[in-house]
């Protein structure tokens, strides 16, 4: 076995940047300077046992944000702490809770973490601090893995209960009478990783917390709420929406940090005509190997289990001669046994494991010690997640390196060519809508089961008597003579509500791989048609499953574990009809609108696409009924397509992959048609469009707008459906719709309406920055006709919608009028 002498991280980076093939792919290289610690003494009121416990661990003072947080909680304030990874947020809530227990052993605390693994890690950290402080504290996790005998002990004697929102919703709140010690004595509720509670999940969790606080009030307690979050654009607003409180924002970080190199890498274009790029996985391997050979602890993040396994296999093979035991390079993902995960985490902390390849399972705050390099094979989907993953390196006051390698997706390409999104603060905001009618009704049923509602009682936005009367018509609740509302059904409402979906009816996903089938998840009906149709490849906790059968009538999908090199994409034909307009304003080249829409969806066939290349390796039919989704949407109309005799159409779904394009009405271009191959989309009279060209332009521009919207709102692109209509029956103009893929919507479309100009300029910049010739999957989507320049057509349309161009044209016209004849 060959060995290499350890080299400094910066030395290895310098060598890498001297390699032309790697250096040329770097689109941006920033160095974030080292930061000195800002400290404060321990509060005078902090119990001496806790102070000694901290000092025994080498902690002789607090960082400034820790001191501010513990003082605020001690004064009875709700807080939200927003500081980077490895800045010591745990002490912000651990110290106030330990102090409360030191003063009153009958006190209780409830810790909420988004995942079981994180909860188990944090309870171990908290228990260790309690032992160091010579405090006998009963802290335990209460999750799906907790044995029944231990559950009973936690209910009666647990001083610190660590759980997740799903268990709180389904196993604690419905049985609150068994938890009366917790609800009577709870002094602090901790909500960690606040930024993960967004979208539908966050909307559900907000209602779970409404139920928690309702029961606390019933039992006579009024706990302080402590939230912690990664950097997002609206942490105080999100915390307020989740908790119904107005927390104090603590975001001045006092923790030290070493210098950090941040590199954005765009694999080179392999085919300018098709837009095919080098693999992000291959480039992740090329960047990781030199650091590993130099003895630098490195983590590589892949976006899916298959990506993790590919990178892991390649690294082990390449390093076999140099490192010997394969155990020094490990994988980490959902599906590993808890004991195996703990061993990997311990090996990383101790330095026995040199490299790890992980899904986002290691993104959250599980303690893995101090790493030197973090490499991301693909944009994780949000800026918050990006910094969480990059922050896995640099936990000591030493120089670290973070590398983000883009895939060919439009979102990745937008981020990689706009470094300001990562380096100049977060533009993205986590959005939830706790008052979404579907979500609110679901939790109102659960809350009524937990205890009766008084006449005029408020739950969320206001009194809920009318909503309870509606539920009463279903036969689930009844009103007594004194006006109180009681649960009257034999159903157990919490078991019928998934925190991960908003639809009132779901498809249960059953894993038939083991001897005893087990439920591994569920999904709403609208998503089920594309995620778990028969023969689909379904991903759960980074594990691939083949859907053997979707029983639509029984609402059950039967799956089994597989390991394949392809994924499935379902073509969804969508028709859309506006129902109501909430807001409508003039915009450059047309109008921007926010309103309610009815979306009808019909899934007809699926494709098998190879990972990495998206090569089509097969297809099959899908036989499922049409579904309707009533939701909210943002749309924009283009009102300058004069002289284009276009019949009204109902549109088709454009939400990703290959989409069905409207039937062409003109097979050949008319004589003398001007070329449309200039990069700026010029070359044709500004207001003259052929129907086919306009269809392509709307589709290309819409895909780019959808990608930019996902970046700005910090959502998965699949959360927003795309429909384009060459002539909308509603507006009688060419229209691009972005609708929320959630019944009733959760507020995303309203935000898009307000950020209309950013969407247009961002989409235009995304397409202009792409080096392809005529459109590709990284900007306007796959080229469906090699003879049509979709890139120039989309740019021509976006230029007509861009207020900057309108202002420039107006300025030029004014100048022309002022020139003497």
What residue ranges belong to the model's regions?
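Structured, non-catalytic alpha/beta "coupling" segments that mediate domain-domain communication
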Residues: 4-26, 541-550, 554-556
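Helicase motor core with emphasis on the C-terminal RecA-like subdomain
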Residues: 17-57, 61, 68, 74-75, ...
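ASCE P-loop NTPase motor cores of helicases and related translocases
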Residues: 60, 102-106, 287, 764, ...
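Hydrophobic positions on the alpha1 helix immediately C-terminal to the Walker A/P-loop
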Residues: 92-93
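Extended Lys/Arg-rich polyanion-binding regions
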Residues: 399-402, 408-422, 440-455, 464, ...
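Short cysteine clusters
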Residues: 770, 775-779
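Short Fe-S-cluster ligation motifs
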Residues: 800-811, 821
